[in-house]
């Protein structure tokens, strides 16, 4: 019976796909899938269903689920089946947006999550990794939280169990419930009291005090509660069981009892709400940190490291949504040798926040997410995949393209609350708001000009003659960093600014603007003496010398007379 149940679970999990297993209870009956999968199930025929595709383009994850769940019976023929699969796969992998390497990473990540043991899958998917390296970091962090080592090739579940909620027990078919009872009686002699099981069938919330009282005649069940074991366990592994992290074999469902686990001092330690007094605030923190999953890891203190009865145990009990789960904090050693309790859940999240597994091979800068690394690498490669359809200008980031498009649309979403003036970019608004705060303005002692503190040091370089930005190629120095970037294009030959009319390219935007006046005929520079107009300021300056020479010639002639 054990092998048949395991084979049945493997077959159903393989059909549903790896990501669906994280959203549903792993041991729910097939008739309960309709509440967890994005499909439409007919009541009279549980085996037949039609995908409920939205009218608008679904997100990639929804398309991936539809791609994995499509059945040949749902389509009219082989041509439609092949066409539907191609469409769903394209919506999922988005080849028009993602590179080949990114698409390959998505496929590898999906397969990596598939081969993980089910207990690790629930934890890894809770953190929603975006790449294989991020999933590996989650597994490593969990491994360190469980046994304090990161180099071992095995994950030990000797002190770990996954709790089963009352609703999940209620949804189990009779065959699986019988299997639970048989496994429990075989391994530890524990039995479920008939009164307790009937209360579960009636969907009633059972106080912890009453559970212990009803289970007291059996003895072993009360011992299980005192040993901080969950009432029902999906893990099902004994204290000697070790599961290789590469093996994805599901473990049989059974009741678990541990006579070696240390219990509470008395039943009176549990209050009326089924929780240990003084631990309510800690329970709320732990419940929020595990918001994405009902699969809660229960760690038990090893026998050699257990505190005495007079010491504070640090046990937690949580009873919510018809679920009773025990959490015992694992002791750790500080640098000074003092023992303390620390939640492995919080420790794992702290490690994940500190780690930056994605490192740039060019400059060594590290990032938390792979997508941030991809965006950063465009600085080195010069890739600019986002192009403006109006003028053809390209950008390395979509946010920069959005800002640029406002120059064509005239949109100014940022408004000053003091004067009502609107701006296209947030940086322009911040610069403008500094004009309202006079206390942040300073006066230059050299020329008397008043400017903001952020521009004061830049302004003072004009008087001091400082040029802190130096080119490594020709050793030419500049006052501003932006001028150095523009100068670098002379050595690299980069010409990012192209004319949309003739295709000619330039290394500076100002040069492109001057060139475009040839096509538009614009002449913005006007001579105040004769009214003649010019395209460039240099042409106007050259023209003004003609008037200056005439004035000088007239002055010389008058002096002779």
UniProtKB/Swiss-Prot annotation:
GO terms for MF: DNA-binding transcription factor activity, RNA polymerase II-specific; RNA polymerase II cis-regulatory region sequence-specific DNA binding; zinc ion binding
GO BP term (any one): regulation of transcription by RNA polymerase II
Biased composition (Basic and acidic residues): 237-247
InterPro entries xrefs: KRAB (IPR001909), KRAB_dom_sf (IPR036051), SCAN_dom (IPR003309), SCAN_sf (IPR038269), Znf_C2H2_sf (IPR036236), Znf_C2H2_type (IPR013087)
Gene3D superfamilies in the record: 6.10.140.140, Classic Zinc Finger, DNA breaking-rejoining enzymes
Main location per the UniProt record: nucleus
Region annotated Disordered, chain positions: 1-61, 182-201, 231-285
GO cellular component: nucleus
Family assignment from sequence similarity: Belongs to the krueppel C2H2-type zinc-finger protein family.
Residues bearing PTM Phosphoserine: 12
Name of the protein described by the UniProt record: Zinc finger protein 394
Residue stretches making up the KRAB domain: 155-230
Pfam families referenced in this protein's UniProt entry, alphabetically: KRAB, SCAN, zf-C2H2
Organism encoding this protein: Homo sapiens
Annotated gene: ZNF394
Functional description taken from the UniProt entry: May be involved in transcriptional regulation.
Compartment(s): Nucleus
Listed Polar residues bias regions: 265-274
Keywords: DNA-binding, Isopeptide bond, Metal-binding, Nucleus, Phosphoprotein, Repeat, Transcription, Transcription regulation, Ubl conjugation, Zinc, Zinc-finger
């Amino acid at each position: 019976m054990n092998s048949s149940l395991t084979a049945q679970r493997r077959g159903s999990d393989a059909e549903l796909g790896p990501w669906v297993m994280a959203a549903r209870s792993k041991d729910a009956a097939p008739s309960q899938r309709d509440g967890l999968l994005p499909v439409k199930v007919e009541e009279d025929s549980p085996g037949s269903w039609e995908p409920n595709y939205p009218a608008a383009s679904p997100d990639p994850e929804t398309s991936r689920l539809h791609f994995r769940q499509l059945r040949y019976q749902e389509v009219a023929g082989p041509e439609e089946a092949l066409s539907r699969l191609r469409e769903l796969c394209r919506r999922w992998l988005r080849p028009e947006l993602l590179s080949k390497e990114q698409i390959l990473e998505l496929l590898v990540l999906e397969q990596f999550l598939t081969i993980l043991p089910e207990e690790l899958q629930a934890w890894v998917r809770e953190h929603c990794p975006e790449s294989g390296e991020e999933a590996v970091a989650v597994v490593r962090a969990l491994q360190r939280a469980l046994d304090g080592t990161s180099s071992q090739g095995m994950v030990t579940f000797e002190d770990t169990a996954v709790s089963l909620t009352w609703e999940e027990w209620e949804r189990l078919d009779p065959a699986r419930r019988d299997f639970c009872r048989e496994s429990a009686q075989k391994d530890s002699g524990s039995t479920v009291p008939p009164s307790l099981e009937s209360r579960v069938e009636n969907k009633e919330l059972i106080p912890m005090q009453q559970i212990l009282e009803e289970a007291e005649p059996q003895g072993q069940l009360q011992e299980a509660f005192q040993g901080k074991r969950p009432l029902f366990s999906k893990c099902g592994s004994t204290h000697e069981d070790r599961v290789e992290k590469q093996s994805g074999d599901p473990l049989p469902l059974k009741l678990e009892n541990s006579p070696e686990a240390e219990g509470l001092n008395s039943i009176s330690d549990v209050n009326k709400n089924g929780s240990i007094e003084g631990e309510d605030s800690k329970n709320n923190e732990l419940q929020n940190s595990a918001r994405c999953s009902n699969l809660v890891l229960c760690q038990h203190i090893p026998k050699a490291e257990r505190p005495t009865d007079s010491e504070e145990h640090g046990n937690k009990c949580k009873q919510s949504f018809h679920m009773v789960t025990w959490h015992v904090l694992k002791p750790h050693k500080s640098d000074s040798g003092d023992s303390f309790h620390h939640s492995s859940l919080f420790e794992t999240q702290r490690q994940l926040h500190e780690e930056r597994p994605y490192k740039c091979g060019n400059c060594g800068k590290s990032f938390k997410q792979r997508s941030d690394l991809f965006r950063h690498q465009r600085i080195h490669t010069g890739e600019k995949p986002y192009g403006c359809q109006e003028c053809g200008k390209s950008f390395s980031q979509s946010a920069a393209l959005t800002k640029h498009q406002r120059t064509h649309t005239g949109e100014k979403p940022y408004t000053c609350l003091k004067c009502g003036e609107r701006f296209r970019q947030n940086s322009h608004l911040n610069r403008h708001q500094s004009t309202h705060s006079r206390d942040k303005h300073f006066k230059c002692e050299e020329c008397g000009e008043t400017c903001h503190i952020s521009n004061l040091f830049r302004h003072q370089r004009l008087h001091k003659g400082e040029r802190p930005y130096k080119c490594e190629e020709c050793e030419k120095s500049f006052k501003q960093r932006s001028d150095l970037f523009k100068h670098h294009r002379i050595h690299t030959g980069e010409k990012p600014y192209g004319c949309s009319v003739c295709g000619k390219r330039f290394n500076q935007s100002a040069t492109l603007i001057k060139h475009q006046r040839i096509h538009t005929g614009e002449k913005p520079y006007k001579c105040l003496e004769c009214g003649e107009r010019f395209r460039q300021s240099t042409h106007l300056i050259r023209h003004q010398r003609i008037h200056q020479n005439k004035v000088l010639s007239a002055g010389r002639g008058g002096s002779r007379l």
